[in-house]
Amino acid sequence: MKRLFLNAGLLLMLCQGIALADGGPDARDRKAARKVRVLREIPGYLAPKDSVTAAEKAEDDFKPSIHVGAIVHMFASAEQSGFGGNVTDKASDWNKGFSLYRARVLVGGQLSRKGSFFMETELPSPIGIQLGDSTKNVKVAPILLDCQYEYAFSNAFQLIAGMQLVSSNRNGLQGAAGLMANDFTYFQYPYNLFANSPLQGNFGRDLGVNARGFLLKDKLEYRLGLFTGRNLDGQAPLRIVGRVAYNFLDPEKDYYYAGTKLGAGNTIAWGAGFDTQGSYYNVGTDLFIDKKAGDAGSVTLNAAFQYMTGGTNVNSKYTFARQIPRQTVQFLELGYYFKKTRIQPWVRYENQNISATKEQAGSELIDNFDKAKSSSVYGGGLNYFFNGSATNLRLSYVARKHNVADAGGAYSSKTYGQVWLQVQFFLF
C-alpha cells in the first residue's frame, strides 16, 4: 500500500513538473513565437496572435532554446526536353519520372535574449533525375544552405551575419514552405543561383552581413547588406543589396517572406530595392497583397518589376558586361484561397526581355542576341491544403517560350511545357 501511495505521489509530482515546464497557454504561445522567429522558413502568420510581442517582452523567464524542423518537396513530373532551353530535334518529346526535389533540415535557436541562430541544409540536386551519363541520381550528399547569426540590438536595428538568402525584391526573399506557386520563379535568381553563376551564389544565398529594422510602428522595414558576391581574387568590390518595404495594413516581420497566407493575411505591402557589385546593378519595385476578398476566402497578388545590367566596360577586371546583359524582368502571381474547401487556384506570368548593348552582345548581332536570350514563362495550378503549409498537394502546368533560330538564322517562337504533381510536408 505504501508503495502504491509513493508511486502515486511521484506520478503527481511528475505531472505537476510537466505542467510547470509547459507553462500553460501563454508559455506555449511564446515558444511557438520563438520557433516561428528562429526557423526562418516558417511563415510568420502561423505564430499565435499577439504571441510575438509577448515573447519579445518575456525576458525575465528567458532560457536558451533550440528548435528543429524539416521541409520536403517530392513530385511526379512530365517535361518536354526543350523546356530548359536546350532545343534539339527531340525538344517536343516528354520526359517523365519521380523526384525528391527538396529535403531540408532546419535548426534554429535562441542563444541569448537578443541573439539567435539559424541553419538549414539542402539537396544540391534532385534525387531521381536522369544524369548525363544515362544513370539515375540516387545518392546526394546534403549541403549547408543557410548558416546565420542574428543579434537584435533593438526593434529598429538588427544584424544578421552569415550565409543567407539575398535579394532586393520580395519574391526573391520568399521561404520555400510558404510558396503559392509550385516553385520559385525563373528570373529572380538568374545570376546568383549556383557557384558558376555571375554572382557566384548558392541557391540565391550569399555570405555577408545584413542590417534590418522596423520603423513607424513596424509599418516600414529596411534592409541593407554587404555580401561577397563574385569573388575572383579577394580584391573585388563587395556586393551591396538594399530594400525598403512599407506595409499599409498589418506589419510583417518575416525574414523570409510568405508567398501566400491562406486566409490569415491582412497585407498590402509595397517595396523597392537595389543590388549592385562592380559594373552590375539591379533596381526594382514590388507589390504584395494578401487579404480577405468576399466570404469565400482571400486573394493573393504578388507582382514585381526589375531593370538590370552588367554595364558596358568590358576592360575592367570586375566587369559583368559579358555576363549580365541589359534587361527588364516582369513577374505576376495571382491566386484565390477558398477557405471552406481549402483549395487555391493560381496563375503566374514572367517575362525576361533582353535589350543588350553592343559591348554586351560581343560579336553577335544585337537583335539575334536579344532574341536568343529573352524568354517568358506562364502557367497555373491548383493547390489543396490538407493542413495549411504543413501538408499540401499541388498540381501545376507551366510553359516556357523561347526564340529558336532555324538553319537559315531566322528566329521563331517555340513553347514547351512542364507538369508537376507535388507533395509538400513541413515539420516544425
Where would I find each of the regions flagged by the language model?
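Bacterial Sec-dependent N-terminal signal peptides
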Residues: 1-24
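N-terminal periplasmic/intermembrane-space "pro-region" immediately following the signal or transit peptide
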Residues: 19-73, 80-83, 218
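Outer-membrane beta-barrel pore domains
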Residues: 24-43, 81, 91-92, 112, ...
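Short, structured loop/turn "capping" segments at alpha-beta junctions
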Residues: 46-48, 53, 252-255, 299
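Outer membrane beta-barrel
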Residues: 55-82, 92-252, 330-355, 373-378, ...
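Active-site flanking loop/helix segments enriched in acidic
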Residues: 86-87
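Short glycine-rich loop/turn motifs
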Residues: 206-208, 257, 284
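Short mixed-charge
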Residues: 250-265
